[in-house]
């Protein structure tokens, strides 16, 4: 597994996705967020995070409404609620190239297996967040 990720897509731009994706973007990583409801706000106002670990503002964030707008990336971070996993077969393929890894930061059981059915078990990273 190659841990050198040059591009990242965050699928699920709620609290978890915006926090961890925002931290990666703050560190200088190329992060793109797949967004539904807050697209216009993020596009217009950027991202503001208030955290016990330090507040930060990203005046500009890369947001997209469809995975096709993002295109293939090195790392996909899935942070949406597991109840949306039925959409994975539509959402993941446009984000993949031959070396893409998929990290899941979701509650519940069976998430890695659902993702593995699409990308192969060798390309799945199961994660936890605090």
Model segments located where?
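NAD(P)+-binding Rossmann beta1-loop-alpha1 motif at the extreme N-terminus of oxidoreductases
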Residues: 1-51
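Rossmann-like NAD(P)(H) cofactor-binding subdomain of soluble oxidoreductases
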Residues: 57-130
